[in-house]
Amino acid sequence: MSIDAQTPEKIRIEDVYKVYGRKEALAVELLRQGADRQRVLAETGCTVGLAGVSTGIPAGRITCIMGLSGSGKSTLVRHLNRLIDPSAGRILLDGRNILDLGMPDLRELRRRHISMVFQAFGLMPHMNVRDNVAFGLLVRGDPRQQARQVASQWLERVGLADYGGHFPDELSGGMRQRVGLARALAIDAEVLLMDEAFSALDPLIRYDMQDQLLELQQRLRKTIVFITHDIQEALRLGDQIVILRAGRVEQTGTPQEIRERPANDYVERFVVQRDEHRP
């Protein structure tokens, strides 16, 4: 279900399949006929990443994509900026199929329209914090002085104004992830992809980062796709939640819909797990 009828979709994922192996077309056809991963592997030797995923990502909201390890959530998010291309299906950004983009337009998409935050921070150890934040701006050709000014502004917004001259190995894990977040936001992209961005952090630092993301989102209203395996994190952050299992969508809904009307036993187990871990 969509969040509400007034919220436009920023991204539309239509019947997306991803399989790895030589008999790709046959594997997709078997999946369309209802075959599971085990049968596809046995008959084609192909490994299934995604099996007919369709969902919408509403503009200006946080969509959490969650599931267990191997469910396809990281594979899916990497399709949204074409780090991975699908075996079949379409991915529309503002109504335009990004699979039709040539390399120059794809580079422009990644430099200006979609940014990404990874679990492993991805900071360059030989650059100081300010230059790490400015990196995306410099890559797309912004003047160095302007890029560093923008980087300093974002460091202030994430609470690291005094750390611009430090190097990544001088920072804690939480601080490094703040740098990664500032770097992603500095290019002012409309879409922010966050792949298990807080998963490696200690629980208290993770909670603080969730708070900071929610606070920034109140002001920025970005379209955020947040990957997590933690139902508590998804329910706390998400305006919409998409739950995957074995490369398929089990349920899409608001946190309230997921809690009150789980689509099946699989989704209900996530909700029960969340309630069992509440203090």
Where are these regions (language model features)?
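ABC ATPase "signature
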Residues: 252-253, 261
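A short, proline-enriched helix->beta-strand linker immediately N-terminal to the Walker B motif
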Residues: 186-190
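Conserved ABC ATPase signature
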Residues: 167-171, 175
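Short coil-to-helix segment of the ABC ATPase nucleotide-binding domain corresponding to the Q-loop/switch region
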Residues: 127-135
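Conserved ABC ATPase "signature" region
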Residues: 30-39, 96-97, 145-162
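Helix-to-loop junction immediately C-terminal to a conserved catalytic motif
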Residues: 81
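Conserved ABC ATPase "signature" C-loop
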Residues: 246-247
